[in-house]
Amino acid sequence: IYEKHFRNAREAGSYIIMDNSLHELGEAYDTDRLMYWIHELEPDEFIVPDVWQDYVQTLVNAKKWKDVELPEGTTKVAVVQAHDYASAFECYHILKNHHGYQKIAFSYGADWYAKEFPHPNPLVGKMMGRIMTISKMYKAGLIKDSDRVHLLGCALPQEFSYYPDFPFIESI
């Protein structure tokens, strides 16, 4: 079903972002399987394999994938993974300035977001925690107006109303 959907979307000229299935499977697909589908579907963007809330292993994967050849026109997107704000800041900095990723994503459900913004409703905590994380990185000058940021899903859709003054958020 998914394959047919993506082939139809490609034929219709739709913009395709291919994920690595970390959220659905708990870990990214293996490299050979990912490469097969990347070459079959030729997505516009590909989310390189990351490791949930583990910035060290995510950076190791991102370093490996930065040199992997993908079809022409496919942009590699790296994901910030972390266990707190400091490691998220470092992860974004390294992905952008050392690994050279042109587009970087933020997941929506990291547990530590709720620690940034404690709230009785954990979904509100995660929503506001991601907003605060991105806002603080922008205010600190790490994220620039010209950066390209993708938001991977959301804890609550109300989150998107907080971003109209963030020119770097390119896609959701």
Whereabouts are the PLM-identified features?
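Non-catalytic, usually N-terminal nucleic-acid engagement modules in DNA/RNA processing proteins
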Residues: 1-71
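HhH-family (HhH-GPD) DNA N-glycosylase catalytic core used in base-excision repair
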Residues: 56-72, 77-94
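Residue-identity detector for threonine
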Residues: 31, 58, 74-75, 133, ...
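Structural recognition of alpha->loop->beta junctions
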Residues: 32-46, 92-107, 163-172
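Active-site mouth loops of central-metabolism enzymes
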Residues: 18-30, 77-89, 111
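Surface-exposed amphipathic alpha-helices with a cationic face
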Residues: 6-11, 62-73, 96, 131-145
